[in-house]
Amino acid sequence: GTTTDFDGNFTLSNVKQGAKLQVSYVGSQTQEVAAAPNVQVVLQDNSQVLNEVVVIGYGVAKKKDLTGSVAALKPDTKNKGVVVSAQDMLAGKIAGVAVTSEGGTPGGSATIRIRGGSSLNASNDPLIVVDGVPLDHNGIKGFPNGLGMINPQDIESFNVLKDASACAIYGSRGSNGVIIITTKKGKRGQKPSISYNGSVTMSAKKKTIDVMTGDEYRDYIKKAFAGNEREADALAALGNANTDWQDEIYRTAWSQDHNVQLSGSVGKILPYRVSLGYTDNQGILKTSDFKRYTVGVNLNPSLFDDHLVINLNANWMWGRNHYADGAAINNAVRFDPTQPVMAEGFENFGGYFEWLSSNSDMKDANWPTITNTNAPRNPVAILMLKNDRARSHNFTGSADFDYKVHGFEDLRLHLTIGGDFGGGKQNTDVDNGSPLSSYWGSFGWADGCKENRTLSMYAQYYKDFTDKHHFDIMAGYEWQHFWRKENSEYRKYYPTNSSLPTAGQEHQLILKNDGKGFRTENYLVSFFGRMNYIYDNKYYLTFTMRADGSSRFNWLPGAKNQQWGYFPSAVAAWSLKGEDFLKDNTTVSEMKLRLGWGQTGQQEGVADYGYFANYSM
């Protein structure tokens, strides 16, 4: 036999023409070809082998060698319906992972729980790591969590760490589980190719709450008040319309998703992948809409005879949200079906019919009535007279270097530098005629931005002693800085007094947030390590330890130092499949007994400067 050089060339001497040659490579299917001069062999990926490699905290492992509870998921290649966010790809796919949509709004977030919640007061959201960059739990305006900012078509795999023994390597941020996302990359030697995938979908309400029609309600009122002294008033309050208020607020929604990918390799050194994505998700509740634009760039060159592997990842996102007020849904069920959507005499209310009461507060001759606070509000007016929208942008990027030391190839040095930067602004304007308003309307805005940086480095040593003993030892350091800023302003107006004042002074500011915001930051410094020992591919031992130093905890002079927390774990496992009594069994593919213990932490319920005394000015 022989091996190829760096360019894939090989030479075999003293081989008869036509003899069968077997060509193999790790992660590829073995090919059998006939010997001939200048023979060319193309190896295909062996998906079964590739799927056995699982990304864990700070490294990878073969699936059969896992000791903690780790689940790997590759997104379906076939269209399984509307997939707007990465969280849609997780729903119902992994045991112990529950994904619950929060209201079903377009582009809305979801609650993700891994084996339930772990805290009564702090966050129960899992830690999300994208290409080695841990995200924070604070979203941006328009995107409450980090998953909504990722184009699902750019995701190569999910790896979910579920139990304490697997999550302890993430220390004070691992108590709720960890979701590790790896994005797609180019392949070495691949010819340039352009691919497109897109979809257009239609959504509609399946059913509505059964309520009376206008005619049924009129008949009911006539019978209910027949012979009653209030019969005349009750009949006079009825309208002549037949309005289905639920039909008025819902619509058939059309959504579209388009993605273009360019991938290939410059020679055999620089694989690349560039992607463009556009999503337009229209909600079935009128006025709700979500748009997202994404750009992804991945470069992963291999240098120095594959001893240095570099992964450069950059993902940009721009989002647009338009929110519909959910109060319209409740009011659509309760509002009088005999009344029209719009009617004459309601000019102060945008022309929309409302139940009114005399205006004893405002003393404005031009505004003699206000909406009756004891009656339902016009659901169409709620939607049409409120403009609530958000604009967002985000960038997540990382530079990942993995160096296999020359002359000492069992040792690998790994460095990751990454960042997560984003911002957004939400504007909310309520028309003066809106039933949600009080006389002269309101307007406001809230914005925020974040800058999160991370630096992690670790060394990993692999060593096999004979065929029985395998050691894998890793030790590293990580530094993280989280910074964010928020501002907001809100204004609402009301008449100044009982008599109309002079022109230009008709309205008084009664509620004002003057726009003062805040800035906050915290640091996390960590040391971590892991040791795996495998004997005879049947018996496994894993130990991990992480020490986290957080600026959120007390460090003041004279106080007990509470900044550092320590998070160990230990696991022992026995692979029954490797024993003689199961080795040849074709029914059981894998069986392993595992005993594990681990300790994780939680710092999301602690304020950045909670140990300082607060003063109000």
Can you describe what each PLM-predicted range is?
Residues 78, 125, 155, 226, ...:
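Extracellular/periplasmic, surface-exposed regions of secreted and cell-surface proteins
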Residues 100, 115, 146, 241, ...:
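Hydrophobic alpha-helical segments with strong N-terminal bias
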Residues 328-338:
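Acidic, Ser/Thr-rich peripheral helices and adjacent loops at domain boundaries
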Residues 340-343:
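Intrinsically disordered, low-complexity regulatory segments
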Residues 434-435:
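Active-site His/acidic residue clusters
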